[in-house]
């Protein structure tokens, strides 16, 4: 490989590493969590695991599997990038042990081996950098490998509290549905009803914030229908409509508050994931169907 071509390959490797780091930062620490590669991989795994008859377990595993695929994609991209950085310089920029030199080493596979070993912070010592900039580059990759491991653990720790809050809201809505809360609100005067609806609106706002911050939570399906917000969201719509028809001013206000929170949540779903472009009820019905639950209608 010529000197100019070698530096071009090195430049491509640096670009791959920087693009991957940008994606990691945007996925994990950007306020809206919008990493290009991560988001594409998540959506692809989600589409591959769309609900099919008899594949319930596969649907539940779609979210965790997608996260694993994203992390593997990040690791693979960084390893490939650093491989391209090292490859043109193996002949002159590294000391290769006598055992390896006897077998005419110094090709792409050796660069890949060096990149993988460095990424894993193992450092066997059979290929050692000698040029000054490479003596800096190799430890930098090792630091990136450790940082990526830490980031992957942080990612998991970030999203599971958001999933817990979403499931808690879903279970609360499921309990209200099983308690015939919609009928009670329509036919009886319940003193605590307005406060209940305001609390539901607040929890829905928190869920919307979580989905904005951790977009990957959308791709997590819940095994139990009672714990799935996609299956329970219609109850919130029915409660809001029932409250808006109440003769009590506080109930009508609470109903409008919940209805507005639902509209904002539906707008986020439609803008980021569904793109059906319909009413709030239509978007929420699409959300329910996308997670593999039957659409019963909001009444």
What do these predicted ranges mean?
Residues 13-24, 74, 82, 100, ...:
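Pore domain of cation channels
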Residues 28-56, 97-98, 168-173:
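Membrane-interface amphipathic/juxtamembrane segments adjacent to transmembrane helices
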Residues 6-34, 66-74:
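Transmembrane alpha-helix/interfacial motif
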Residues 160-184:
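Membrane-proximal helical linkers
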Residues 177, 181-192, 196-299:
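Soluble C-terminal extramembrane regulatory/interaction domains of multi-pass membrane proteins
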Residues 1-5, 18, 22-26, 78-99:
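Juxtamembrane "helix exit" motif at the C-terminal ends of alpha-helical transmembrane segments
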Residues 60-83:
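Membrane helical hairpin/interfacial module
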Residues 50-67, 126:
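Cytosolic juxtamembrane amphipathic/interface segments immediately preceding
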């Amino acid at each position: 490989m010529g000197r100019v071509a070698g530096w071009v390959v090195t430049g491509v490797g640096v670009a791959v590493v920087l693009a991957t780091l940008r994606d990691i930062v945007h996925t994990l620490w950007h306020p809206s969590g919008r990493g290009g590669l991560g988001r594409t991989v998540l959506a692809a795994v989600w589409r591959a695991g769309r609900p099919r008859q008899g594949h319930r377990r596969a649907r539940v595993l779609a979210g965790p599997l997608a996260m694993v695929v994203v992390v593997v994609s990040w690791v693979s991209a960084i390893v490939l990038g650093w491989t391209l950085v090292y490859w043109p310089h193996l002949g002159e920029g590294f000391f290769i042990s006598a055992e390896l030199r006897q077998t005419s080493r110094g090709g792409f596979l050796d660069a890949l081996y060096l990149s993988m070993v460095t990424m894993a912070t193992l450092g066997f010592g059979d290929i050692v950098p000698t040029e000054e900039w490479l003596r800096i580059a190799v430890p930098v990759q090792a630091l990136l490998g450790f940082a990526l491991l830490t980031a992957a653990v942080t990612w998991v720790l970030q999203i599971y509290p958001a999933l817990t809050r979403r499931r808690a809201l879903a279970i609360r809505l499921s309990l209200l549905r099983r308690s015939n809360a919609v009928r009670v609100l329509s036919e009886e005067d319940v003193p605590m009803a307005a406060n209940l609806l305001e609390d539901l609106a607040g929890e829905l706002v928190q869920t919307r914030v979580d989905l904005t911050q951790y977009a990957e939570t959308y791709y997590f399906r819940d095994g139990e229908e009672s714990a799935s917000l996609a299956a329970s969201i219609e109850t919130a719509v029915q409660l809001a409509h029932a409250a808006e028809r109440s003769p009590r001013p506080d109930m009508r206000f609470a109903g409008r508050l919940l209805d507005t929170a639902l509209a904002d949540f539906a707008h986020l779903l439609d803008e980021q994931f569904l793109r059906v472009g319909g009413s709030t009820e239509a978007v929420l019905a699409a959300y329910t169907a996308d997670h593999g639950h039957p659409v019963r209608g909001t009444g």
